């Protein structure tokens, strides 16, 4: 019985050694594949965006329509990056400077619900920076993004 156990233990140790060698070989193959993948990814360039990155907005009322069109267009062609209203609002905020940036600070400090509502955020911007209501009706499609 002891001899049988010794033989069984020896067989198990041999199998363990063979599996360890196979595991090492597989790990090396995996390492090579990961390196090859990284090399291939470096060679592939992402497609260029057909819409340029929007300009910043400093609160100048006459530039608000242009700013909204630019940001809406950019978000539309990059919709995978702007999957919800909070992401869209955060993007707009990242482009605010000067008076417009100062305007948004209180909303951020009080964690206003408007920061998660793209349409409401645009409405607040329009109200603060002087957007004519007649233009609002004409440009409603641009706001929907």
Curated annotation (Swiss-Prot):
Q: Subcellular location, in the record's words?
A: Nucleus
Q: Does the keyword Nucleus apply?
A: yes
State how it assembles.
Interacts with NOD2.
The entry's function note states: May have an important role in the development and/or progression of some cancers.
- This one is known as Protein LDOC1
* A Pfam family assignment: DUF4939
Q: Would you tell me the Gene Ontology cellular component terms?
A: nucleus
In which family does this protein belong, per the annotation?
Belongs to the LDOC1 family.
Tell me the keywords, alphabetical order.
Answer: Nucleus
The species is Gorilla gorilla gorilla
Please, one GO biological process term?
Answer: cellular response to muramyl dipeptide
- InterPro entries in the record: DUF4939 (IPR032549)
